[in-house]
Amino acid sequence: MEKLKPNDVEKLEVIKDLVDQFIDLMLNYRQSGHPGGSRSKVHMFLSSLLSGYVRYDLRDPAKTFNDRIILAAGHTIPLVYSTLAVFNEAMRLRYEETKDERYLPKKPESTLYPKDLLNFRRRGGLPGHAEMGGKTLLLKFNTGPSGHGITASVGEAFALKRMGLNDVKVVVFEGDAGLTPGGAHETMNSAWALGLDNLFFLIDWNNFGIDDHPLTETVPNTPNEWFGSHNWRVVGTIKGNDFPDVFDVVNSLFTDIQKNIPNIAYFKTRKGRDYLKYDNKSHGAPHPMNSEIFWQTKIPF
């Protein structure tokens, strides 16, 4: 894939801004949820979905042979809800303009639109953690706790390989704190031992979980050592909130594949990017409803 052109970056920045606003408004209205990790993953999530490498059909997310997308950091589900709201609203508007039925969803009742964000974490509304169902059939596993989704990803990737479906990828989005459970190391070992070159991790390396101290005070080294010591192919950038750099890494992740070697890309970010509440303080803690600091976050937009 060619490098991003300036016009492409401008478009991605607009999409990112819209996703950011939906995350903020949804959580401020509900007064619950996780803004920090949701915001820090926006660049890598959008770059992956819009790269052309991840195969999915927005109109039919349950379609056979779609890539298996897993939000291992299931508590950052506001990221997915907000992204789907932007994408599906764009498709709806394009249909209104053109009347071209290619823009229509296969099942409107399973399509997430901006109005659905108002029912986040409410009875009958959008769940507080990632679920493979309802309006998020794009996702292929129910997740929430740290390390939960990454272990399941090995099972899915192995099953696909056994069925001969080597071109169906398992694409996993996780934060660095989600790699601290013991199951993460078993996952890394198993993925390499099973030759899962169809497995792709994208790691939000923001150096914070829920604790006051940075991750590096208890977990030494970097993603290069964490995964490289298990013989994974590692690529990454220290500019994880910069679209040109992120896109280059995504391009490398999905093209420079080595036979039987699992793949991981890391993106150095700031948890709570542009939310004016950072690091662990942004974990599970939206700004008070209609507070002055909340509206300060809207000024750049």
Question: What is the predicted function of each stretch?
Answer:
Residues P35-G36, I70, I264-F267:
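A structural signal for short, well-ordered beta-strand segments and their strand-loop junctions
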Residues D8, K16, R30, V172-F173, ...:
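A short, structure-level motif marking secondary-structure boundaries and short turns
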